[in-house]
Structures are given as structure tokens and as C-alpha cells.
């Protein structure tokens, strides 16, 4: 009889330990694959899961490349982008999209294709961030604003090729 309470405590402790390990693994998995978290820069960007097999590590590598290769562009991404979706949408398999709505008055959601590799992904992130900045500045969406953002992705491509 005296052994049962200790046995019950051990069982409860074991269940809590297993639950703690499961929760820790879940949190690490979510952060590893679905969150860019840069404590030093106060930058947190969520990443949606890919429905077509693209790995979010390309987006994380692109953000790390921006962080070291173009700190100013990295700060802009951190300030204006809350979520990155790696699934092809309106930009198709080679581009990206900026979604503008009243819900994006804070930080925006962008779609980014990772199909063409790291440097192209960086350029798409910078391009779509340019649209987010235009929107947050209150500029009306017009086709001629596209020229400015194409200039931004061209600039970052040239800068990173020289950086590498």
C-alpha cells in the first residue's frame, strides 16, 4: 500500500516529462520551419507551409543573405513584412505577390516563389517589400509603381552578385 502513492507520482511525472518533450519538439519544429526570428534586430516573420514541396529554408537563407549582404534592405523587410508565403500564387512559379488590404496596414503578407534559387528569392523578397513600402506610404496602386520595384530587385541582384 505504501508503494502505490510513490508509483502514482512516478507515473504522473513520466507523463508530464513525455508531454513536455512533445511540446518542446513541436515548438522547435514550428520555429525551425515556419518562423524567422532575429532577436537582435527585433525581427519576427512568419512563413506559411508550402503546399507544393518548397522548403522554407530557402526563404530563411534568403533572409540571412539580406541580413549580411544588404542590412538596409533587411531592415525594410523586417519593418514591412509579417508573413511570407512560399506557395506560387498570382506571381506564378517565378515571381511573387504583395497582398494589399486594410488588414495589411501594419506589416504585410507577401508571396515568394523559391523555384529559381537563393539569389532570385532574395530579389523577389526585396521587390515585394518595395510594394509593401509603397502601400504603407499611402501611394495608390498603379502599374507605374512596378518600375520602382523592378529597379529595387535589379539593384539587389547586382549588389549580391558583387557581394558573393
Task: List each language-model region with its residue ranges.
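Short pre-active-site segment immediately N-terminal to the catalytic Zn-binding motif
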Residues: 109-125
